[in-house]
Swiss-Prot record:
Catalyzes the NADPH-dependent reduction of glutamyl-tRNA(Glu) to glutamate 1-semialdehyde (GSA). It comes from Erwinia tasmaniensis (strain DSM 17950 / CFBP 7177 / CIP 109463 / NCPPB 4357 / Et1/99). This is Glutamyl-tRNA reductase. NADP(+) binds at residues 189-194. Gene3D superfamilies: Glutamyl-tRNA reductase, N-terminal domain, NAD(P)-binding Rossmann-like Domain. One of its GO terms (biological process) is protoporphyrinogen IX biosynthetic process from glutamate.
């Protein structure tokens, strides 16, 4: 049995190819069934995200399997091998195990250390469980990878620092305000960055969340998810004073929040401080706002400096994380090799039990026929000894005849001979 991992990701393939090799939730069950129908495949997991598509497999043997799997992948997605081969990577054994551990820990992600990938790996694992496509070895490998990812998060600082604009904005807010549960937040816009910020702030249980957007319908979808109030862009001037934190990211060519608007809001707030985080390019907040007392304005460039500093911290943490992966993958492979001996041990024990039972039955029969008990006992011990040492004796003799000193020493060690 061999463990394999093959696939493409953001480092090896452009998005134009990645999107053509994606397995959608609607097609995943069919894909797993098709994959498991391939010769020599004992178990399979399909991991498909926007940045990677990977197959994790346990196979009877790996000889000639690479061409078979590439052909299956290309046939399934109606691609030619030439389109895929240059972007495909292939790992087996310890390399496959360590690759999965790195993926689950966020060490192979576009954003180093990002936590979302672990949830995606767990979902892929659960999908294979439901589809009954997991082998025992694959199940153990994935469970081990989950524990390694948890250990990496616990023992290193891989996830402690913000490395996305949205997360950096929220981290900045948490640094300035002791608790987000007492603050009101106004989000301006409803794009991806604002969506991420809204979810993060919702998780930290802000007191009140407001979303202002040009398209009310889009804002309402996000607001329903994060329990926010939707307001129009025209309402910002009137409602700005309610906000302790403003995070803005729109595509407006002109500023939405001007100096006069913030001055009026601060007056209503009796000069209680406001944090304004302007992520937009062009800027949503007039730069002169930053000159106002009690108005703390940060631009996307300010956040980028935080992100770059934090990325350096994550890269240092990644070195520690890689050490954990090396150790854990080695431990897993040792366990896997030990498992290969389990069946042999079981067969050897069964063989010994069979010999014991046969000779024991004969001895009991002799005793029942009145034979001398001491003679029967000695005869049983002699015959059982001969049965048990017969195969090892033949192996020792053959190794000696072949002049194979290394095999002879292995046999001696196995038999406990000094």
């Amino acid at each position: 049995m061999t463990l394999l991992a093959l696939g493409i990701n953001h480092k090896t393939a452009p998005v134009a190819l990645r999107e053509r090799v994606t397995f959608t939730p609607d097609t995943l069950e069919q894909a797993l069934n098709s994959l498991m129908a391939q010769p020599l495949i004992q178990g399979g997991v399909v991991l498909s995200t926007c940045n990677r598509t990977e197959l994790y497999l346990s196979v009877e043997q790996q000889e000639n399997l690479q061409d078979q799997l590439i052909a299956w992948l290309c046939d399934y997605h109606q691609l030619s091998p030439d389109e895929v081969l240059k972007s495909l990577y292939w790992h087996h054994g310890n390399e496959a195990v360590s690759h999965l551990m790195r993926v689950a820990s966020g060490l192979d992600s576009l954003v180093l250390g990002e936590p979302q990938i672990l949830g995606q790996v767990k979902k892929a694992f659960a999908d294979s469980q439901r589809g009954h496509s997991l082998s025992g070895e694959l199940e153990r490998m994935f469970q081990k990878s989950f524990s390694v990812a948890k250990r990496v998060r616990t023992e290193t600082e891989i996830g402690a620092s913000a490395v996305s604009v949205a997360f950096a904005a929220c981290t900045l807010a948490r640094q300035i305000f002791e608790s987000l549960t007492t603050v009101n937040v106004l989000l301006v816009g409803a794009g991806e960055t604002i969506e991420l910020a809204a979810r993060h702030l919702h998780q930290h249980k802000v007191k009140k969340l407001m979303i202002a957007n040009r398209t009310r319908e889009r804002a309402q979808v996000l607001a329903a998810e994060v329990e926010a109030e939707v307001i129009s862009l025209a309402d910002i001037d009137e409602r700005l004073a309610e906000a302790d934190i403003i995070i803005s990211s729109t595509a407006s060519p002109l500023p939405i929040i001007g100096k006069g608007m913030v001055e009026r809001a601060l007056k209503k707030r009796r000069n209680q401080p406001m944090l304004l985080v302007d992520i937009a390019v062009p800027r949503d907040v007039e730069p002169d706002v930053g000159k106002l007392p009690n108005a703390y304005l940060y631009s996307v460039d300010d956040l980028q400096a935080i992100i770059e500093s934090n990325m350096a911290q994550r890269q240092a943490a990644a070195v520690e994380a890689e050490t954990i992966v090396v150790q854990e993958s080695s431990d897993f492979m040792s366990w896997l090799r030990a498992q290969s001996a389990v069946e042999t041990i079981r067969e050897y024990r069964a063989q010994a039990d069979e010999a014991r039972a046969e000779l024991e039955a004969r001895a009991i029969q002799s005793l029942q026929q009145g034979a001398d008990a001491e003679k029967v006992l000695r005869d049983l011990a002699h015959k059982l000894t001969n049965r048990l040492i017969h195969a090892p004796t033949k192996s020792l003799q053959q190794a000696a005849r072949d002049g194979d000193g290394e095999r002879l020493q292995i046999l001696r060690d196995g038999l406990g001979l000094e």
